[in-house]
Amino acid sequence: MNKLKKIIFVSLQSIMIAGIVCFAVCPISCKISETGIEVIGGDYVPPVLESVNVIDDKTVKVNFSESINLKGYVITEYIEDESDSYEHSTDEELSLALRTVTDFNNGIVCELSFENDNSVVVFRLHESTKIGKKYNIFAVVEDKTGNSLTCCVPFVGFNSKVAKMIMTEVRSVSDSKNGFREYVEFLVIEEGNVAGVQIQIGGEESKTYTFPAIDVKKGDVIVYHPEKVGEGIENEILDDLTLCHHTDSNENARDLWGNSEKSVIGNNDDIIVLYDQVNDFIMDAVMFRKADTVAWTKNKQLAADFINDAGIYDSSDIENANYTKGGTAPVSASAKHTLQRLNTSDILQKIHNDEKVELPVKVDSESWQIVKGGFSAGVVE
C-alpha cells in the first residue's frame, strides 16, 4: 500500500513539474510523451512581415515587426500559381520561399540598405520594374535570438505615370431580361497608365476593382462592367477594342470586366470613388440616392468620410448626393435611364482644345442627373 502511494505521489510530482515547464517555455508548443517533455513547435516568436511598399520603379521597402538579419533573398518576376498570396513559414519544412532563396542565379540584381533599427529592408533594383508587372521577393530573415521566417511576397511594378480620368455615366440598375447590366463609364483626360487605379463602390472592399496595366490616351473611353454575366465578354487589355460583343459593349471604348455574378452597384443609393493609389489621390467621386434616403449605411458612410475633404462636393453629407429617384430627378434610375455627368461636353471641348482639365472636377447636387433613355455605354458626348 505504501509503495502504491509513493508511485502515485511521484507521478503527480512529474505531471506538475511537466506542466510548469510547459508554461514556462510558452509560446513553444509542447506535449508530454512517454520519455518526458518533447518540443514540437519551431522557435519562439519569429519576425512578422508587416507591409511592403513600392516607392518607385526601382525601390521596394519591406517592413518587419522587429530588427532582423536578412539571411538570403531573391527578387524574381511573378511565378504563376505560386505567388498569388503572402506565404510565411516557421516550421522545419522547405517552403516555396526557402526553396527559391537557395537559387540566386535568376534573381534581379539589387543593393540593400536598412532603416529603423534594421526592421525595414530597402531593396534598390538595378533595373526598373515594368508598370503593373508582378514580381516576388523571396526572403529568409532572423531576429536577434535566431527565430526565423521565410516569406514569398508579391508586389507590382510602380506606375510612374498614372493616367487621369473622370466618370461620365453610371448605370446602377440591371435588366437581365434584355441583357442590360450595370456599368461605369470613364473619360481619360490625361494620358498615362491606369495600373493600380481603383474603382471603389459603396465603401466595401469586396466591391473594389483595380485596373490592370494599360496605356491609355487623352480622350479614350473605358467602360467598367462589374457583373461578368452574359455572352461575348472579353477584357480588352490590349489595343484591339473589338473583342467584346456583349450587349453593353462598344467598339469605340475599352471594355473591362469585374468578376461578380450579381449586382454590385446600389440601384438608387451608392457612392463610387475613382482612387489613385500611387499618389493617394481621389480623382473623382459620385454620390447618389433616392429622395427618401436620409442617411448612408455604415459602409457607404465610410466612403463618404473618405471623399469628404477631396474637394469634389462641398461636403459628403447625404443632402449633397445626386438624385436617382424623386427630388430633382426627372425620371427614376433604370436600365434605360442612367445617371450622367451634365458637363461632360464642356470637358470634352477642353480636351479637343488641348486645354488642361484640373482634377478633381468640382460637382454639386445638379452636376449629375438621370437622363431618360439616354444610356450609351462607351459613347461620350
Residue ranges and their predicted role:
Residues 59-65, 70-159:
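Acidic, low-complexity Ser/Thr/Gly/Pro-rich repeat segments typical of extracellular/periplasmic
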Residues 31-44, 48-57, 147-203, 261-268, ...:
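A structural motif detector for short, solvent-exposed N-terminal "entry" segments of globular domains
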